[in-house]
């Protein structure tokens, strides 16, 4: 039976970020997606100018209540949340997750804790604090990048070993799995892009090429979370889902770099989202 994921993220009319980077890849992999947009912007915020705004937080809950009213909420297998437009939306996500799990106790919640960083992503005050304080106790899985992981544990991280320790501290607060979408390891080659996935008993490290963009494309993290969620819903083991994610994201990023584009080449690389031609084996990053 086809799996269904409720994806609560931003939407851009032009380009690929948030749901605009996540929905198509998940569908291409064979997962039904119910997009719930937290904001609707003309384009992503790293252009420096954009129009649009956030959806009302109460309307988010009302929309999910509407799905429940037609008897479809028990079909939801997972909730994926990403960029939130207001602190009130973060509270609405908690209500939505509670409603989904009440309708389907087997459903799980994957939190991509978008906090904003030096990269230019604009996040409203109060959202980071909510994500750090509350979401680890609610999420079944979390997908921070390096900076977000540091904020979640309250200290700097410089090595793989320190990252695994930080992930395990986070796991002790609630989530069963932590996917580090981008890990900065001082011991890794400068031309490699590192990722890490950690559970209570497993830790897998993976690398792909780091492409020399003049401007790094936006939406790579959203794509990463989406592919990992989809492959997990399709029944992959943690390692298999991780390796497929690493390979599929590499295919999209490589196609974007080769085309000289700023926006992700999702359509051009769609066949490799499903069946990547290049594969990158993960290795054990640590054992509990």
Curated annotation (Swiss-Prot):
Q: What is its EC number?
A: 2.7.1.35
Single biological process term from Gene Ontology: pyridoxal 5'-phosphate salvage
Chain positions recorded as substrate binding sites: 10, 45-46, 222
What CDD domains does the database record attribute to this sequence? pyridoxal_pyridoxamine_kinase
Q: Which cofactors?
A: Mg(2+)
The chemistry this enzyme catalyses reads: pyridoxal + ATP = pyridoxal 5'-phosphate + ADP + H(+)
Q: Does the keyword Nucleotide-binding apply?
A: yes
The record lists ATP as bound by 112, 143, 148, 181
Q: In which pathway does it act?
A: Cofactor metabolism; pyridoxal 5'-phosphate salvage; pyridoxal 5'-phosphate from pyridoxal: step 1/1
Q: Which GO terms describe its cellular component?
A: cytosol
Give the Gene3D superfamilies listed for this entry: 3.40.1190.20
Q: Does the keyword Ribonucleoprotein apply?
A: no
**A single GO molecular function term of this UniProt record:** ATP binding
User: InterPro entries given for it?
Assistant: PM/HMP-P_kinase-1, PyrdxlKinase, Pyridoxal_kinase_PdxY, Ribokinase-like
Function summary = Pyridoxal kinase involved in the salvage pathway of pyridoxal 5'-phosphate (PLP). Catalyzes the phosphorylation of pyridoxal to PLP.
Task: Please report which protein family the annotation says this sequence is part of.
Answer: Belongs to the pyridoxine kinase family. PdxY subfamily.
HAMAP family attached to this UniProt entry: PdxY
This protein's assembly is summarised as: Homodimer.
> What name has this protein been given in UniProt?
Pyridoxal kinase PdxY
Question: Which lineage do the record's taxonomy fields give for this organism?
Answer: Bacteria, Pseudomonadati, Pseudomonadota, Betaproteobacteria, Burkholderiales
């Amino acid at each position: 039976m086809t799996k269904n994921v409720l994806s609560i993220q931003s939407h851009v009319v032009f380009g690929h970020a948030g749901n605009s980077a996540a929905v198509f890849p998940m569908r291409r992999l064979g997962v039904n997606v119910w997009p719930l947009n937290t904001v609707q912007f003309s384009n992503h915020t790293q252009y420096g100018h954009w129009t649009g705004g956030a959806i009302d937080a109460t309307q988010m809950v009302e929309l999910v209540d509407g799905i429940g009213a037609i008897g479809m909420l028990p079909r939801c297998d997972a909730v994926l949340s990403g960029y939130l437009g207001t602190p009130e939306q973060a509270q609405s996500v908690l209500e939505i997750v509670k409603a989904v799990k009440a309708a389907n106790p087997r459903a799980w919640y994957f939190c991509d804790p978008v906090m904003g960083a030096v990269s230019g992503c604009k996040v409203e005050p109060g959202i980071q604090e909510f994500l750090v304080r509350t979401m680890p106790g609610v999420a079944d899985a979390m997908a921070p990048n390096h900076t977000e992981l540091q904020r979640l544990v309250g200290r700097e991280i410089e090595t793989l070993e320190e990252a695994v320790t930080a992930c395990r501290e986070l796991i002790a607060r609630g989530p069963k799995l932590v996917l580090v979408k981008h890990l900065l390891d001082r011991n890794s080659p400068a031309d490699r892009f590192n990722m890490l996935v950690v559970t209570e008993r497993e830790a897998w490290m993976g690398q792909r090429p780091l492409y020399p963009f003049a401007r790094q494309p936006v939406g790579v993290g959203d794509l990463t979370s989406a592919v990992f969620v989809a492959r997990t819903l399709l029944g992959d083991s943690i390692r298999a889902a991780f390796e497929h994610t690493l390979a599929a994201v590499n295919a999209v990023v490589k196609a974007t770099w080769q085309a000289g584009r700023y926006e992700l080449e999702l359509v051009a690389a769609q066949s490799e989202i499903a069946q990547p031609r290049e594969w990158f084996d993960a290795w054990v990053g640590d054992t509990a």
